[in-house]
Amino acid sequence: SITMVQALGGYAEANVWLIVAAVFFSRGIINSGLGKRIAYTLIRSFGTSSLKLAYALACTDLIISPATPSNTARGGGIVFPIVQNISLAFDSEPYGNTARRIGAYLMTTAHTINTITVTIFLTACSGNLLITSLGAKLFGYDISWWEWFQAGVIPGVICMILMPWFIYKIYPPEIKETPEAAAMAQKELDALGPITKAEISVAIIFVLCILLW
């Protein structure tokens, strides 16, 4: 058996509360609609081709990843529905012979980028925080948020720049130009309406916490 102190000792870990805070932020980004607004704004501005669409999705993942400690929630809750909407708009279904029109390329790229952003930010995945906590106990050195970022940002950004282009070359979509994407993104932004107080609050808290971390 274990003592009450041992049973509750985990609640004293700073990394545990960092995970809890980041989970709250991730729900705020998803529920407020801020994540979708960021994604559709980038698509409206840069999504004139399938390659640029991939980079817009990559930038979306990069922007929201510091406050979403689950790459599954980030990919499945924000990025995946957007990729699905874009694919269906171009009649690209996951089954049958239309997947290669654009959906397969965007989905493969989004999945790849989702795993890359995990390496850039400590709070992009709860597993990162567990690793640093375990490392601190075993080796007596606790890696800070800033130290993790310094170590991961250069290789991570290089991979983010190269991978959409690399996948585009080895697994190219049939549709190269996507002028309709901007109009689709604008339609989605119109449906979201003006930016809300909740989105502004989440954005301010998000930026402040990143600076404080």
PLM segments and residue spans:
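Residues within alpha-helical transmembrane segments of multi-pass membrane proteins, especially transporters
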Residues: 24, 28, 59-63, 67, ...
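Generic alpha-helical transmembrane segments of integral inner-membrane proteins
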Residues: 20, 24, 59, 63, ...
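Membrane-embedded alpha-helical segments and adjacent helix-loop junctions characteristic
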Residues: 2-95
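Juxtamembrane and boundary regions of transmembrane helices in multi-pass small-molecule transporters
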Residues: 71-75, 90-204
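Generic alpha-helical secondary structure signal
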Residues: 54-58, 130, 206
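Structural signal for alpha-helical transmembrane segments and their membrane-water exit/capping regions
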Residues: 1-3, 22-33, 136, 167-176, ...
